[in-house]
């Protein structure tokens, strides 16, 4: 089912609150939920049945903390977390058993934990987890009868299980990244739709509302980068995902163009606000160009949301042809005798066409060559669309 056209405010509201997106969020986290449940259960079982510890609280807790990590370098950060948590628990248990609990004991435990962590590793995660582990022992758990080693072993067990689950039961390296690409392109499409409608109606207020809502879109861009980093690491660590490396590289390749689309759309929208507030206008041709790139961005968003390779193979060439046609139409003549704001809107429209072509698979050089030249000595020889082709 194709995505429907929405204004910027409605699009961002849908991303945050709609039942469909809530269900998608639950579906996207199902694997994490399963991983966490399995990791906690396995860590607890190993600590109780294999190591014979009576109350291995830190085994399942460490596993869940490790599996909750997101973004790139999960294995490295998981190792740092495991080391910090285990050493903090061990140090706290050892010290509290000797000096008891109280306010000055907390001072000693945290201070020594941070000193030891600074010596062991430069990573902030190690320092934080050592301090937190020591505080937990000092404030919530009395020292164990068996000394400091049992709880420290439990923490190592949980961390080790978490790392193994990350490596052996990986999540899809593509689904989260493609979903975030779809979100960002959907937001860009809504912004451009609002711009085109506002330029027609000379409605600066609507554009200001869209820009205010658009400030929240950076979270989607950040999630895109996080998802792509996670996917890249997953295909490096897990042998089950080595076959997806090429597709993850393709996803990584479009990160910059996707980010540029939303950035250029923001600049275009801000300039459209200035233009409408000044009671100036753009040509009908410019509005047509903005409407077209908005529709193409929405189509791309829909493709990435549903990730059907057959659909992509059929639709991407069609979208490229539409963009090539637009590239031949965005010459200086459609903003001739217009104010500076109209010229800036034209320049941003040209930039977004290049970004969308790169998302469709073209190199930047080939994408720029699609544009009708605005210079007597263009850096890349033009490859303009011919209606007779």
Swiss-Prot record:
Q: Which InterPro entries match?
A: Memb_transporter_dom
Taxonomy, superkingdom? Bacteria
Q: Supply one GO CC term from the record.
A: plasma membrane
Annotated membrane topology is: Multi-pass membrane protein
RNA-binding keyword on record: no
TM ranges: 31-51, 96-116, 123-143, 152-172
Q: What is its main location?
A: membrane
**Protein localization:** Cell membrane
Keyword tags: Cell membrane, Membrane, Transmembrane, Transmembrane helix
Entry's family note: To M.tuberculosis Rv2571c.
Record protein name field: Uncharacterized protein Cgl2769/cg3067
Which species expresses this protein natively? Corynebacterium glutamicum (strain ATCC 13032 / DSM 20300 / JCM 1318 / BCRC 11384 / CCUG 27702 / LMG 3730 / NBRC 12168 / NCIMB 10025 / NRRL B-2784 / 534)
